[in-house]
Structure formats: structure tokens, C-alpha cells
Regions:
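Short secondary-structure junctions
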Residues: 8, 137-139, 146-149, 258
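Ligand-binding beta-strand-loop-alpha-helix segment within the catalytic cores
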Residues: 130-132
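Extended Gly/Ser/Thr-rich low-complexity repeat segments
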Residues: 137-144, 267-272
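Ser/Thr- (and often Asn-) enriched beta-sheet segments in non-cytosolic proteins
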Residues: 102, 111-113, 139-141, 146-148
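Internal active-site segments that recognize and position negatively charged phosphoryl groups
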Residues: 141-168
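Glycine-rich, charged/polar anion/phosphate-binding loops
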Residues: 134-136, 144-148, 177-179, 189
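Short, solvent-exposed secondary-structure boundary/capping segments
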Residues: 120-128
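A glycine-rich beta-to-alpha transition motif near the start of alpha/beta enzyme domains, typified by
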Residues: 1-120, 160-272
Length: 272
């Protein structure tokens, strides 16, 4: 039996490989979801704590619509992990009984497919669209260092740094500086990438508006696309992150198909 749809001031919390989100239906809220309230709700000490908020919206030429709100109150164009969480939420809470449907985001419309086992969602596959990969490497001067990177868009911006020597300490130092670098007037997501073999990459992630995260679907797609374009990997690609692994397939037309889990945590009522 599905869980009930969200009622007045309720939310659902889920994570995808440790990347956690709150899911909210704005129509049920008794107060406006302002940037100030978003920052409070996402705060790990003063609020519920999350890497962002997903809101259920009317679909734009799609079955459902999704907005992705960052912990700093800004809005993201697309989130691979957020999409998987959102798609499972729709099925688990009875908004749809279909296993295939479409979702519109500010970064474009995506198609989703749910893999069920015993009536429960096991994995979610999302066609993330095509990646736009920079034709040549670029260089940014950051903290006295020249950092070579690949510029990628998968509906949202990414700065992919392919360098096996980079550590988590480097990510925490370079991530916020690259995110706000003048080369990225709208800010950017940052990935530090190591190519493990011809079908595997390992990445550390700094998300625009959120900071370090354990996993990111769109970052995985961007990093894999950059490595594929440079001839470092071939499809299929496994993206290994601190929170877990994602499977990526690059279709002949350039579409990126992402498959991974999403895990419900709890449902509650907002009092803040």
C-alpha cells in the first residue's frame, strides 16, 4: 500500500547515496517557502538538515514538475540524485502508480523508469539528457595554483578537474573558490576526478549552493562525460563516490542514462 500524499505542512525526507533532500508540496504549506526559511530548514543544527529541498510542481509538457532548492536559498537547474528521490517519492506516496513517467525541471525534461521488486522501488533510472563538454581544457588560477578543468553542462554547470593527486583537503580548499570563480558568473558545481580504469571513475564533489556532498547524480554524469570526451573511459561507466556508486550508460545519441537507488528516511510535520 502506498503512503498517503503529503497533508498540511508535511514533508518527506530521503537520501540518495547519502545526498539528502526534503520533499515538499508547496500547496500544502501554511506559509511561504522563502529563501530565509529554506536556509533554516536545511540547517543541520537549527532545522531539519538537508542538502536541499525538492518541491512538487505542475509539469511543463511533462507528467510532473520539480524545483530544486539549494541550502543557501538559490535554485538548481537539475539534480540527478534529487530526481531519483523525487521519482520514488511520487510512487511511494501514491501520486502515480506508473513505473515510467516524465518530470520537468528548470534544466530540461527527463524520463524516469522505476525498477520494482515485491512492489517496492529498488532502483530508479533517469535519462539525464545530453552533456555539453568543452572542446578544450581551460585553466583557472585559484589560491596560487593553476587548475586545469573541463567545462561541462548537463542542464546545470560543472567544473571537472581530472587529477588523481587531488584529495578531500584539496576539494575543501578549491571547491568554494572554483564555485565562485569569475569564469563561472552563475557559479558552478566542482568535481575532483580520478580515472580508475576504462569503465570506472572516482570523484569528490563540491555542489553549488550546498558545499561538499557525499554523492551527486549530475556531477557523476558531467565527470563521466568529460572523461569520455577525452578518451579516458568508455560506456558503461561506474561513478564511485563517498556515498556509493552510480551506473551510467551513454546511448548512441549522446543521452546519459543514470541508474541508482533512493532511500526514504521519514515523514514529518514542519513546525519552523
Amino acid at each position: 500500500m502506498p503512503l498517503p500524499k503529503l497533508s498540511r505542512d508535511e514533508f518527506a525526507k530521503s537520501h540518495a547515496l547519502g545526498n539528502d533532500y526534503l520533499v515538499i508540496d508547496p500547496k500544502t504549506l501554511s506559509w511561504p517557502l522563502t529563501p530565509e526559511r529554506i536556509r533554516l530548514l536545511c540547517h543541520r543544527n537549527l532545522g531539519l538538515g538537508s542538502d536541499g529541498i525538492l518541491t512538487l510542481e505542475p509539469g511543463k509538457d511533462a507528467d510532473f514538475g520539480l524545483r530544486i532548492l539549494n541550502p543557501d536559498g538559490s535554485e538548481a537547474e537539475k539534480s540527478g540524485n534529487g530526481l531519483r528521490i523525487f521519482c520514488r517519492f511520487l510512487h511511494d506516496h501514491g501520486y502515480t502508480d506508473r513505473t515510467e513517467f516524465t518530470v520537468s525541471t528548470p534544466g530540461g525534461k527527463v524520463s524516469a523508469k522505476l525498477d520494482l521488486a515485491g512492489g517496492e522501488v529498488r532502483l530508479i533510472t533517469v535519462d539525464m539528457g545530453k552533456a555539453e563538454v568543452g572542446a578544450s581544457d581551460e585553466t583557472a588560477e585559484v589560491a596560487g595554483r593553476k587548475i586545469r578543468f573541463v567545462r561541462v553542462s548537463v542542464g546545470n554547470p560543472h567544473c571537472v578537474v581530472i587529477d588523481p593527486s587531488l584529495t578531500r583537503e584539496d576539494l575543501l580548499n578549491l571547491g568554494p573558490r572554483l564555485e565562485t570563480h569569475p569564469l563561472f558568473p552563475n557559479r558552478t558545481n566542482v568535481q575532483c576526478v580520478t580515472v580508475v580504469d576504462g569503465h570506472t571513475i572516482r570523484l569528490l564533489i563540491w555542489e553549488r549552493g550546498a558545499g561538499e556532498t557525499m554523492a551527486s547524480g549530475s556531477s557523476s554524469c558531467a565527470a563521466a562525460a568529460a572523461c569520455l570526451k577525452r578518451g579516458l573511459v568508455e560506456s558503461p561507466v561506474k561513478a564511485v563516490m563517498p556515498g556509493g556508486d552510480l551506473g551510467l550508460i551513454f546511448l548512441p545519441d549522446g543521452m546519459i542514462r543514470m541508474t541508482g537507488p533512493a532511500t526514504p528516511v521519514y515523514v514529518g510535520r514542519l513546525l519552523l
